[in-house]
């Protein structure tokens, strides 16, 4: 099963709120997901980003591919840097 880490859109019209989820790559954007690992609210000033670091690293190390947007968010949160350090130590 190919898994992706991506955003699930919630909220109202013109006021989006996203959950960062791990889902099967074949499931629809707002459909079924395996696990929720965080949330992102771009409407607040500054934008709120909360990601469970342990869960994200677990899924990335097991082969889950982040979408382009989630990759940028993980980079902003510093999780990809910690993942690279972990690989370098191994």
UniProtKB/Swiss-Prot annotation:
Q: Look up the record and give one Gene Ontology term from the biological process aspect.
A: translation
Q: Name the source's superkingdom.
A: Bacteria
The family note in this entry says: Belongs to the bacterial ribosomal protein bS16 family.
Q: What is this protein called?
A: Small ribosomal subunit protein bS16
Q: Does the keyword Ribonucleoprotein apply?
A: yes
* SUPFAM superfamilies, per the entry: Ribosomal protein S16
Q: Which gene encodes it?
A: rpsP
Coiled coil (UniProt feature) = none
| Organism annotation | Heliobacterium modesticaldum (strain ATCC 51547 / Ice1)
In its UniProt record, a GO molecular function of this protein is: structural constituent of ribosome
């Amino acid at each position: 099963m190919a898994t992706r880490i991506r955003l699930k859109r919630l909220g109202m019209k013109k006021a989006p709120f996203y959950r960062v989820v791990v889902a099967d790559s074949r499931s629809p954007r707002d459909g079924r997901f395996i696990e929720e690992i965080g949330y992102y609210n771009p409407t607040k000033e500054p934008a709120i980003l909360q990601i469970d670091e342990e869960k994200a690293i677990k899924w990335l190390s097991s082969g889950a591919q982040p979408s382009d947007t989630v990759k940028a968010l993980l980079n902003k949160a510093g999780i990809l840097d910690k993942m690279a350090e972990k690989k370098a130590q191994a």
